[in-house]
Amino acid sequence: TSKVMQNGVHVANAGYDWKLTTSGSEEEASGLYLNYGLTQVELLGQGDSALILYATPGLPENSLANDLSAKVVGSGDLKISAVGETVSLSNPENTYTGGTFVMSDSTLKLGADSALGATKEVNLAERAILNLNDHSQEIGKLTVATDAQVDMADSSQLTVKEGGTVSAGGLKGSGNLIVQGGTLEISGANADFHASTSIKPDAAVEINSVLGLGDNEVQD
């Protein structure tokens, strides 16, 4: 295990072991190799002391070089900095409980169900994108800033347990949205949102537009 230092602060622990890897992209992987590499990241820091994942610029969207396949654990926060690029998390056994913060103009893509572990919050800064990529994820609070967006493809499912706030146009796609708890406040219309929405008994959704939840059915 090695300490991960960031600006002089111990923000995470990294575990290494032998593992099977591939190279290239998801569509054009070049076979399997046995390598000694990163297998686990334990998040420690929160807020300004959170671990920041940076994207390598200029690579294809599905490049494995911008994918974190190691298991992510711990109670710290995770920040994604990928201006104009995409970072993905692809380990379905992730269990981290801290917040997930996608910084301005960055995209975070799920490569597996539950890739965000048991994150207590997903916070999308201006023009940031969370791409569920046909996967399912449960989160605590959801915050979607101006011009940011949660992109839910056909078989995607997002469960929000603790409400939150969504700006106009912040929801897109035709998967499933489950509001399980808290109050989700949606400001403005989401004309590109065609998902089925389920509002559980302990939850509420507040909208100020007839298209706040798009144009599909709403169940309660």
Task: Give residue ranges: language-model regions.
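FAD-dependent flavoprotein oxygenase/oxidase catalytic domain
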Residues: 76-77, 82
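Surface-exposed loop/turn positions within long extracellular repeat scaffolds
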Residues: 40, 44-45, 65-75, 86-158, ...
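Small/flexible residues
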Residues: 5-8, 12, 21, 81, ...
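Extracellular/surface-exposed low-complexity segments
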Residues: 1-69, 153, 157-162, 174-183
